[in-house]
Amino acid sequence: MYFDRTKINVESMKQAILERVYCGVVQTPQSASTRDIFTAVAKTVLEWMAKGWLKTQSSYYDNDVKRVYYISMEFLLGRSLKSNLLNLGLLDLVKEALFDLGYDFDQLVEMEHDAGLGNGGLGRLAACFLDSMATLEIPAYGYGLRYDYGIFDQKIENGFQVESPDEWLRYGNPWEICRGEYLYPVHFYGKVKHSIDSRGRDVAELVDSQEVLAMAYDVPVPGFNNDAVNSLRLWQAQSRHGFEFSYFNHGNYIRAIEDIALAGNITRVLYPNDSISEGQELRLKQEYFLVSATIQDILRRYTKTHLSLDKLSEKVSVQLNDTHPALGIAEMMRLLVDREELDWDVAWDATTKIFNYTNHTILPEALERWSLDLFSKVLPRHLEIIYEINARWLAKVSQKYPGDNDKRRALSIIEEGSSKFVNMANLAVVGTNKVNGVSTFHSQLIKSTLFKDFVEFFPDKFINVTNGITPRRWLALSNKKLSSLLNRTIGTEYLTNLTHLHKVIPLAEDSGFREEWRNIKIQNKEELAARIYKELGVTVNPQSIFDCHIKRIHEYKRQLMNILRVIYFYNEIRNGSGEIVPTTVIFGGKAAPGYAMAKLIIKLINNVAAVVNNDPKVNDQLKVIFWPNYRVSLAEAIIPATDLSEQISTAGMEASGTGNMKFALNGALTIGTMDGANIEMAEHIGKEHMFIFGLLEEEISELRKEYYPQGICNANPTIQEILDMIAQAKFSQEDKDLFKPIVNRLLNEGDPFFVLADLEAYINTQNRVASLFKQPEEWTKKSIYNVGGIGFFSSDRSIAEYASNIWNVSRPTS
């Protein structure tokens, strides 16, 4: 079935869905379950996309376009049914058709599991970028891994995070197409055998290696309101040998499937626990598996229409989303030199023109460094290649800085010392054409700190592309009421040019418009409150401030500071110290399985919630929610109902953030530090329409030299009281020592994320929030200004900048 937009109507849509019920899931409308109907609808939509998908890919070949390959360990897609229908322009028609057939569309949507392909902002950014690349008709492909169990399902048991498998593929993925014809070998371990060929070239061959196969699965990515459909290709690891029948026949059932299990482990879960050596090894194998299969596929596609590799760098641009795929640089060199027999200099020239690197962090633990022992064991040939890259690179460094060993050390890809490491960020800089940060502040920071020495060598390599979000999912899809109001008052152009939102700013002075705006927020809050009660059993007041802190749990994101503030307000209520504006504080986010402190912070939040929510003196003045298993589909419910967006990272540690943009797009006001994209948001929205507080990055750098957290407690009895309550087991009577690591972190381990340094300013700013919330007309004006000023932060704008300033690509001519 090919989708013809001009011929589709409710009746033809009903017929198409029923055909899939009968022929696709082999049920009758009477016997089909809700899941069957969801699958039938999804398969119908997939068939509607097929013609555009094929036409798009054909146009790339016909026009011999330069293609973009976006490689990422994460793609946090969320659910696809509503998003695909919205982009195809069929959402309302499908809803009507299903209603006529007697089905509830919202129930069908709930049948779809969020795709288990990501965890945090890195993956969600990649997903927004895929949407924008298709909408802008950029010839692009996403490449990632098809994880069997995602990162994990988060459950809360007795306040603790408990990880369980994310069974997102239990019922299959109706959006994927298995491409069995694209099966690539990927090799690990072994040893390198060198010989001289007839032309006198050194030939490297990996022998005695372990071979794993990469199987391709394609997921369509439709653009908004056009016929373009790009591809996200995901790799699944499979054993070369498969089921060992001889072992099975002799009763050795475990050995019979051992190879299948070991190979499959590579794509079993996202980010295996790297606090153990086995987890580190598996992570390295994951990253190499991704880039090896991807680059083999890129070369296959290129050589399909080109007889030589002369134009490879003119037709291919690869974007590395963080350092995880940086091994692709060494893999491209291996394939070009070892397999294609190019001279080293020719191969290196092509490679450094093809690859580009997006840096997402300056946090030391997130900048990948692989021990030489592990690297040489898993990827011996690639270590040789990296040594050669480094030797040639350091020769250039020595030419520019003769005798400067400190400069050589700083710029080396290999870190010397008692233990040696491969520095993947340095490899990513040396082996790429452009390096970009993801906010103006972050880009300045990496140039002045992390890559300062590289900037001296490559002054033109480093640029900025501020992150963005897709307004299709984060407004039109998730906040139908607000988008309908905007459509009616300022038109729909903002969906493809978000700067048109500025047209709403004059309406902030219209009292009738403000009332409509306010009523939409209240309705969204009432719906969320009902869901909180249904799923979590907690009654919250929709008239309270909905104060939301939903993101990955990490010390630098300072969920700890937020819960300390909650304890402060709890004490204020208990002591009767003045009027408190009713507040509902909502937390959500996952902690990495091996990150003990982050998991303990989750426990503290839940224990504080248990005390606060059950204290009759508090009543409805303060409620604390930790919503388990935070994910895209949950964010789509929380963000439209939020009044206050928590963006309170330690200044200098958040590269950009995109949650801040999503909240502002939905009319929430931001409380935040001058960090990441908050700084640019303040410029575009107006600092007066946000609640900015806290130390600046340069102030933190100075304070770090002589920071004494205990002195803050000595000077502020209120803060000391909060820590005493934690230390004295007010929130942990089952285990009086439970939260001592948190108190120690703050007082005895230097408070590395400056929680106590910013806490008083944070509390004072929260008091300003409460004062403004008591003035609904003024609050609503600022809410409108937030939406009107957020237009710069579209992923369409981000992708247009990548296309122009990094990739040098444009849409096909036909």
UniProtKB/Swiss-Prot annotation:
Superkingdom of source: Bacteria
A Pfam family matched in the record: Phosphorylase
Listed GO biological process terms: glycogen catabolic process
Broad class of enzyme this protein falls into: transferase
InterPro entries: Glycg_phsphrylas (IPR011833), Glyco_trans_35 (IPR000811), Pyridoxal_P_attach_site (IPR035090)
Single GO cellular component term: cytoplasm
Protein name: Glycogen phosphorylase
GO-annotated molecular function: glycogen phosphorylase activity; pyridoxal phosphate binding
Keywords, in A-Z order: Allosteric enzyme, Carbohydrate metabolism, Glycogen metabolism, Glycosyltransferase, Pyridoxal phosphate, Transferase
Required cofactor names: pyridoxal 5'-phosphate
Catalytic activity as recorded in UniProt: [(1->4)-alpha-D-glucosyl](n) + phosphate = [(1->4)-alpha-D-glucosyl](n-1) + alpha-D-glucose 1-phosphate
PROSITE patterns: PHOSPHORYLASE
Protein family membership: Belongs to the glycogen phosphorylase family.
